[in-house]
C-alpha cells in the first residue's frame, strides 16, 4: 500500500512516516522543509505538484498546515487560507483526479473553541460537542473538515477527519498534567491513522484522537473546582512522584477529551497515557 504523508518534517508527520514504514507500507514523505523523513520538497499550495505526488498513491495522510503558533509569528489570514484551505482542496482534487481511495485529514480539538468554556464544570469533549471556532486557525480547520465531507459524499473519496489533541513540546510537569485530560503523544496519533488505513468507512466520520482519560462524566463538576481530589481518586501513587519533583497538580481542569468513538470504530488503544508516563517517571525514565 502506497501512502503519501504531507507535513512529513513536522512532529506528527515524521512519526507517522516512521510508524507506517515499520508496518511495511511504502511511504512518500512530502514537506516544504527537508528532513530525514521527507522524500520530496513540495508545497500543498502548488496544484501541479499535488497532482504529481499523489499519482499512484493508495492513500494520503494530510498533516501539513499552518498552526496556532503561526498566528504568534504574524502569519496573515490570507496565509492560513492559502495553506490550510486551498492546500487541502488541491490535495482532495488531486486524489479524485488520480484515483486515490483514502484521504485522512488531521484536524484539531482546538476547533471546539468557545464550547470549551463552562464556569460550572469541566466540558466533556466528544464529537457531538458544537464546533465554535475562535480564530483563523480554527476557521480554516473547520472549512477543511467540511471539504472532506463534501468529497466523501459527492466524489466517493474515503475522506475522514482526526481531531488530534495537544502534542506541543512542554516541560515534564505540564506534559504529564495535560495527559490527564487533553494531551496526545504523537506516537499514539500515528497509530490512530495507521489503524484507519485498513478500515472501510461506510459514512463520513470525524474522530477525536487523544491520550484518553480515566475521568468520567460524573467527575466533571469536581474536576472544575477541586481537580487534585479527583486525580487522587484514580492515581493515588502520583502524589509521591509529584512531591519528589516539586510538581503541582492542576487545581482546576476545564475539559476532558473523549476518544471513545475512535476506540470503538478503529480499536484505538493509546499507549502513552498519563498512567504510562507516570510509571516511566517513577522508574527514572522519561521519553
Question: How does the language model describe each region?
Answer:
Residues 3-23:
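N-terminal Rossmann NAD(P)H-binding glycine-rich loop of SDR-like oxidoreductase domains
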Residues 6, 30, 60-64, 103-109, ...:
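SDR active-site strand-loop-helix element
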Residues 36, 44-83:
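NAD(P)H-binding glycine-rich loop region in Rossmannoid oxidoreductase-like domains
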Residues 82, 86, 117-159:
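Catalytic helix-loop patch of NAD(P)-dependent Rossmann-fold dehydrogenases
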Residues 90-132:
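Conserved Rossmann-fold NAD(P)-dependent oxidoreductase catalytic core, especially the SDR/UDP-sugar
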Residues 191-287:
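C-terminal substrate-binding subdomain of Rossmann-fold SDR/epimerase-dehydratase oxidoreductases
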Amino acid at each position: 500500500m502506497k501512502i503519501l504523508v504531507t507535513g512529513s518534517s513536522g512532529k506528527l508527520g515524521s512519526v507517522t512516516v516512521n510508524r507506517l514504514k515499520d508496518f511495511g507500507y511504502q511511504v512518500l514523505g512530502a514537506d516544504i522543509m527537508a528532513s530525514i523523513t521527507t522524500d520530496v520538497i513540495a508545497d500543498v499550495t502548488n496544484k501541479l505538484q499535488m497532482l504529481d505526488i499523489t499519482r499512484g498513491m493508495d492513500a494520503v495522510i494530510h498533516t501539513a498546515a499552518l498552526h496556532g503558533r503561526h498566528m504568534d509569528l504574524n502569519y496573515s489570514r490570507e496565509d492560513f487560507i492559502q495553506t490550510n484551505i486551498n492546500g487541502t482542496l488541491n490535495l482532495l482534487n488531486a486524489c479524485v483526479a488520480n484515483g486515490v481511495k483514502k484521504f485522512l485529514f488531521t484536524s484539531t480539538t482546538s476547533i471546539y473553541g468557545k464550547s470549551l468554556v463552562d464556569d460550572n464544570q469541566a466540558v466533556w469533549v466528544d464529537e457531538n460537542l458544537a464546533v465554535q471556532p475562535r480564530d483563523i486557525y480554527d476557521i480554516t480547520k473547520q472549512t477543511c473538515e467540511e471539504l472532506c465531507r463534501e468529497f466523501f459524499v459527492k466524489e466517493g473519496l474515503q475522506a475522514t477527519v482526526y481531531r488530534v489533541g495537544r502534542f506541543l513540546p512542554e516541560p515534564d510537569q505540564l506534559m504529564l498534567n495535560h495527559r490527564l485530560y487533553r494531551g496526545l503523544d504523537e506516537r499514539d496519533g500515528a497509530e490512530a491513522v495507521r489503524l484507519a488505513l485498513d478500515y472501510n468507512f461506510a459514512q463520513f466520520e470525524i474522530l477525536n484522537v487523544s491520550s484518553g482519560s480515566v475521568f468520567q462524566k460524573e467527575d466533571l463538576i469536581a474536576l472544575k473546582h477541586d481537580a487534585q481530589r479527583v486525580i487522587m481518586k484514580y492515581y493515588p501513587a502520583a502524589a509521591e512522584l509529584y512531591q519528589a519533583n516539586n510538581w503541582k497538580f492542576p487545581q482546576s481542569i476545564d475539559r476532558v477529551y473523549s476518544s471513545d468513538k475512535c476506540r470503538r470504530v478503529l480499536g484505538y488503544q493509546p499507549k502513552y497515557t498519563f498512567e504510562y508516563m507516570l510509571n516511566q517517571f517513577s522508574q527514572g525514565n522519561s521519553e
